[in-house]
Amino acid sequence: MKLLINSKEQIIVEKVLSLLRFGKQTTRYKDVFDIYYLISYSIDVKKVVKYFECYVFNNENFEEKNMKDVSDSLREILYSKRIYTNLKLKEYNWLNISVDVIIKKLINFFESI
């Protein structure tokens, strides 16, 4: 039996996809911390961009057409009152890192690629 595992890059894109799809209505708060954790380690940025091109930029169901759009959408979602408040709850923050630090790193990461 063979076990197939998604790459870190694909996991990042899938988690961001979920945030973009549900926007301010998301309940997947732990995904924000997972994404932070994954981008904190060595990843292939070219693969991340490639996956975004495949799953987001070329998909008419998403408004985002480039990485700037992605970072702008994430900023709007993550700083919305309900999401930001819930991200501060200890039950979701398994990294025990400041939510502001996490959000800034996510936005900076996606702005930089």
Language-model-detected regions and their locations in the chain:
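Structured mid-to-C-terminal alpha-helical surface segments
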Residues: M1-I113
